[in-house]
Amino acid sequence: MKLGAFYKGGDLVKPSGGKKGRVRKTKKKALGGGPPQIPKLGEEDIRYVERVRGGNHKVRLRQARYANVYIPKERRHVKAKILSIVSSPSNPDYARRNYIVKGAIIQTEVGKAVVTSRPGQDGVINAVLIE
């Protein structure tokens, strides 16, 4: 992905219309990470590893089909298939587009559950059963 399009530095044009010279070349840390890659509901789980600031690595989720659902009454976790996204409090449009984010309510094989992890950051979907 070309990150030059996401540079948010100062303009190189003065208010009078004259041109300013560059103070320094664009550094990688000033480019940002590009547009957010929000995980979607798909046919299988697809993950990728990305290098982030400080030389660390993050496992990001691109597509998801399964979630680790915690059942409070039974005090156990199950791997359940995600059937659909019911709603998303952060953005109503995310539910229509099948984006999975923290706080989203998903319909699974065992019932409705709330996503408690951050799939784009953690690379896994953890949820708690609500019905």
Swiss-Prot record:
It comes from the Archaea. It holds the Pfam family Ribosomal_S8e. Residues 17-30 have a biased composition (Basic residues). Part of the 30S ribosomal subunit. Gene3D superfamilies: 2.40.10.310. InterPro entries: Ribosomal_eS8, Ribosomal_protein_eS8_arc, Ribosomal_Se8/biogenesis_NSA2. One of its GO terms (biological process) is translation. This is Small ribosomal subunit protein eS8. NCBIfam families: eS8 (TIGR00307). Keywords: Ribonucleoprotein, Ribosomal protein. One of its GO terms (molecular function) is structural constituent of ribosome. It comes from Pyrobaculum calidifontis (strain DSM 21063 / JCM 11548 / VA1). Belongs to the eukaryotic ribosomal protein eS8 family.
